[in-house]
Amino acid sequence: IIHTWYRGNEGGPMAKMTKFSSWNADAVLGRYMVDGNKEFLLDMVKDLEAEYARWEKTNRLSNGLYWQGDVQDGMEESISGGRRKQYARPTINSYMYGNAKALSLIGIMTGDEGMAMKYGLKADSIKTLVQDKLWNTDHHFFETMRGDASAEVREAIGYIPWYFNLPDASSQYDVAWKEVMDEKGFSAPYGLTTCLLYTSPSP
């Protein structure tokens, strides 16, 4: 199915591939780690690199972070975002980090030092920006950035950076996880809420 998404539009990507966020490079590498199908992995490299470059061209802000509408980010409507708002969100920036790390690892696997370094530097840059700009030091949480200011709301998407092991292993960031089990935080009878249940800073 991934060949259809990337090559099903007269040899090019399907139209929606250019609108909705994804961590496909990370996923394709993850599949290789399971099935060992190197031929499939290498066959996808040019497609994955082209997709990465496209996101850089269309969704990178002047500060180096990436923006996305909440609907196109798989969140439908959210407190922090908007369908047509170009806000830097923890989600897409984590995806771009994960994809850059994956492409760098593919470069290492194939002996392509230039590719490995290119995407390794991109990943390092995104990591620094996410930790410096999306971390709200008052709320102790990764939050969406509206222009030059935080959206000032803690949402479940603030945990996405950990899916890609982006944050430094530090109590500075680990403190965010105490909200998961807090019934006044994200904990609810049927799973996590999409946003925090209270608005004041954590005690």
Predicted regions and their residues:
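Active-site acid/base region of carbohydrate-active enzymes
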Residues: 1, 32-91, 114, 118-121, ...
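Aromatic-lined, polymer-binding surfaces characteristic
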Residues: 1-28, 69-80, 89-100, 107-110
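C-terminal extensions
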Residues: 15-17, 95-105, 125-133, 148, ...
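Short acidic-hydrophobic sequence patches enriched in Asp/Glu that either
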Residues: 20-23, 40, 44-47, 122, ...
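Well-ordered alpha-helical scaffold segments within catalytic/enzyme domains
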Residues: 23-40, 94-112, 160-170
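Alpha-helical scaffold segments in soluble metabolic enzymes
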Residues: 54, 102-105, 175
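Aromatic (Trp/Tyr) and acidic
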Residues: 86, 93, 151-182
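Conserved small/polar residues in nucleotide/adenosyl-binding loops
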Residues: 198-203
